[in-house]
A protein has these predicted regions:
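N-terminal leader segment of winged-helix/HTH proteins
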Residues: 1-62
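N-terminal helix-turn-helix DNA-binding core of bacterial DNA-binding proteins
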Residues: 35, 45, 49, 53-96
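Short amphipathic alpha-helical segments with heptad-repeat character
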Residues: 38-41, 45, 49, 94, ...
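Short amphipathic alpha-helical elements of helix-turn-helix/winged-helix folds
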Residues: 74-78, 166, 173
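Short, charged, intrinsically disordered terminal tails
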Residues: 85, 172-176
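Short, hydrophobic-biased segments on the C-terminal half of alpha helices
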Residues: 86, 104-105
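Charged, amphipathic alpha-helical coiled-coil/dimerization segments
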Residues: 105-165
């Protein structure tokens, strides 16, 4: 391979693995700092951006953004009557309570959900997926699952299982 081709391959590899490049800088400039955690954490953070970009592209075809999709899909997979209290929704989503309240208000205005008092507890509220919301989210759920499978197809089944185990263990330790 000629020098120019080797340089081109090296640049392509660097662009694909920005974390590895950054770690090289750390090793060179601050070798006294153990930055080995960056090998995993940095790649998870980078993948977060890559995954969200792909998911957003998929959901945009359905006129959705991820937070509204996550609420509707979570309600849908509860089964009939496709309902949950906001506190239960909040525990399953990565949103603040204020963020969820604003999102639910917009979704109710758009006819995707309804909010009503909880029959079991007059003080509580129940969020329900509407037929309109269900008609939007069901095809989006299929496309979202396709996108997720597309994103992980570069990994063998064994690699996927190993990642699930390792990431689950990390997530368990990160819980407050």
């Amino acid at each position: 391979m000629r020098k120019a081709e080797q340089d081109s391959v090296a640049i392509d590899d660097q662009e694909r693995d920005l974390v590895g490049v950054g770690m090289g800088w750390w090793h060179r400039e601050v070798p006294q700092i153990d930055c080995s955690g960056k090998a995993v954490v940095g790649r998870i953070l980078h993948l977060h951006d890559v995954i969200l970009r792909e998911v957003d592209r998929t959901l945009a075809r359905h006129g959705l953004k991820y937070p509204a999709y996550a609420v509707m899909a979570t309600l849908r997979v509860q089964g009939p009557p496709y309902a949950m209290p906001p506190k239960a929704l909040l525990r399953t989503l990565i949103l603040s309570s204020g963020g969820l309240s604003n999102l639910l208000r917009r979704m109710e205005r758009d006819g995707q959900i309804t909010r009503s008092s909880d029959d079991r507890d007059g003080r509580g509220v129940i969020v329900r997926l509407t037929e309109h919301g269900r008609a939007i989210v069901e095809p989006a759920m299929r496309d979202h699952a396709d996108t997720e499978r597309h994103l992980v197809r570069v990994l063998s089944a064994a690699e996927q299982r190993a990642m699930v185990q390792g990431l689950s263990r990390m997530m368990g330790r990160a819980q407050p």
